[in-house]
Amino acid sequence: MKNYRAELTGVFGDPVDDNPTGVVEESAFAAKNLNYRYLTIKVLPEDLGKAMDSVKIFGMKGINLTMPHKIKVLPYLDELSPAAEIIGAVNTVIQKEGKLFGENTDGKGFVTALKNSGETLDKKNVTILGAGGAARAIAVECALNGAAHINIINRSIEKGEELASLIQMKTDSSAKYLNWKNNMEIPSDTDILINATSIGFSPNVTDKPDIDYTSITPEMCVCDVIFNPAETIFLKTAAENGAKTITGLGMLVQQAALNFTLWTGVEAPVDVMEDALKKEFE
């Protein structure tokens, strides 16, 4: 007998109209011939509790959470992964046997994309621009994957110091906060430089982080979390200095692939998902 009831996944956020994750996940469901759907749902902050109840009521396999729900969702979850507990934010929820499990795949997606490019984090010095949600997840996962030291460059002293302190206290990596000054020089011993801010994201494609680009060397690997455009001015300028560069597309695809497997138990068709994402931004 044909089954007309699809398994449901989706994303809760506000705004969510420009979120491309559904296209990526739906391409994977189709490629694996799974009767799953991904719903892009606007959820206002005051309605988050009801929305989380609906995950259980509708028997959803899981959901993604985007701004402004990644931290506020925590009280509605039954359990957190070790990384999500350290980060203090969740972007993925998995429902199993009526319980909601929180995971953070932001940093994991970044680390997977980095390793796929041939890089390793073991004993490396990492410098991160920003101290927001993406920076936090990436910093924790870099530390958990063997980074020796992490520099946090941020304009807000409070946020920057808090993240550096978190890394020092909860992981085996050392960490330091550096106040983001104009034309900020990148520490010369940096192996991996990451822009974890939204500077340069469409439509502000001519913007780039205010750093001294002459301090980027060919020995560095330079990464951006921004996926639209893929080749940001930040990455183009770093490449002109001889640095290896990694776009934000890989992080987004790997993050979506992790979500897919967490929800379905099936290995993700990463190539299909990457093609679907690239088509969205052609």
Where are these regions (language model features)?
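Glycine-rich adenosine-cofactor-binding loop
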Residues: 13, 104, 119, 123-144, ...
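Conserved beta-strand positions in the Rossmann-like core of class I SAM-dependent methyltransferases
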Residues: 39, 150-151, 246
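NAD(P)-binding Rossmann-fold cofactor-contacting core
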Residues: 145-170
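Rossmann-like adenosine-cofactor binding region
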Residues: 172-245
